[in-house]
Regions:
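Loop-helix junctions at membrane interfaces
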Residues: 1-180
Length: 180
């Protein structure tokens, strides 16, 4: 296969994975599952798969798509804690844009793809090692998303997040948010 056709093939594969991320983001109850306090997400799954199949750079691009769709989704369909993910939703007790929400919405998602891609690349080999590398990359990618998003929420919006959920940071769930 020539270099040009290999490049085109890779670009098409990345575009298809990005389309899956966008599709999951905007189909109700598919990519974001509303829970009592926050929306659980499955959108990180194609980001991790893309990172495993296409590498850390592609994983970072897919993570960026995930982050941008998260901002859009939380802006057009706000929930109680959407101020953590959209600069257009003011945090309780604040007026005006909250630009730290862009850090929470985008940076961890980019790092999901980068981390998963590098873990896979470092661990992958033949046979069982490849399976282990896929599992490790999936776990690291999921943990990267959860831990960095929750830590960002605690760091930038801890009091507002606790207030939106009627839970002080000193309560056990507030402590869990801090511990993450």
């Amino acid at each position: 296969m020539s270099t040009a056709s290999a490049h085109t093939r890779r670009m098409v594969q990345l575009s298809l994975m990005a389309a899956i991320v966008v599709l999951l983001s905007f189909v109700p109850f598919l990519g974001y599952i509303p829970l009592v306090v926050i929306k659980a997400t499955t959108v990180h799954i194609p980001v991790i798969l893309g990172a495993i199949l296409l590498g850390p750079k592609a994983g970072g691009i897919l993570g960026g798509v995930f982050g941008i769709t998260s901002v859009i989704k939380n802006t057009i369909e706000p929930a109680v804690v959407s101020f953590c993910f959209s600069p257009f939703i003011p945090a309780p007790g604040h007026s005006g844009p909250n630009l730290f929400s862009l850090v929470i919405a985008i940076l961890p998602r980019v790092l999901v793809g980068v981390a998963a891609g590098w873990v896979y690349r470092l661990l992958a080999g033949e046979g069982r090692r490849q399976t282990l590398a896929c599992v490790a990359a999936s776990v690291i990618g999921s943990l990267t998303n959860t831990l960095l998003v929750m830590r960002g929420i605690w760091l930038f919006y801890g009091e507002a997040y606790g207030g939106a959920n009627n839970v002080p940071l000193s309560a056990p769930s507030g402590l869990a948010l801090w511990a993450v």
